[in-house]
Amino acid sequence: MATTARPPLDARPPWVVVINAASGRQEGEAIAGFIRDALGEAGIQGSIRLVSHAEEIPGIAEQAARQARERHGILVGVGGDGTLSAVAAAAIRAGAAFSAVPGGTFNYFGRSHGFPEEPQAAIRAVLHGELRPIQVGQVNGQVFLVNASFGLYPQLLEDREAFKRQWGRSRPAGEHFRQHPLFH
């Protein structure tokens, strides 16, 4: 497969950042401030979109990806694996460079690519890193970075997310599974 040579990040292309404010520890505002400061210190132009509702991420990522391509910049996703997959998919469709700042709960993508666990350290790593190709997968037009799931498992994940929205993270997960139709 042919690859396109990309300049190192030290060439200072602008950043277009999409942050999922609800990811991980829900520190979106603080991370946005850190990115603004880091970009300013590095002399890099940037725009930041802080997204409060996860369902808005794909549309906002598409707009941001077009902006990144037009500015010859980098589309940077900040959030969990789902956020990063949505932002990467938008970058692929737009033909924009993509980078990630893992900021979710599990951060499988970040761990598999050697990103630091703390978002501030990951941001510094991206500032001083180089662009390089990564492997992505696609099933039925859906891009994924870590894995794709079929059958019961994705339904359980959707149910878990709905449960967390309704009851919060502190309720025992066992209560949810005890009431799930599969177990009746």
Regions from the PLM with identified roles:
Residues 1-75, 85, 121:
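ATP/NTP phosphate-donor binding region
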Residues 42, 51, 92-97, 101-184:
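Catalytic core of DAGKc-family lipid kinases
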Residues 21, 78-80, 101-103:
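Glycine-rich beta-strand-to-loop/alpha-helix junction loops that act as flexible
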Residues 24, 53-54, 80-81, 115, ...:
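Short beta->alpha junction loops/turns
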Residues 20, 81, 154-156:
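A residue-level signal for conserved active-site and pocket-lining positions in enzyme catalytic cores
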Residues 58, 78-93:
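Beta-loop-alpha module in the N-terminal Rossmann-like domain of NAD(P)-dependent dehydrogenases
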Residues 29-31, 87-91, 111-113:
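Short amphipathic alpha-helical segments
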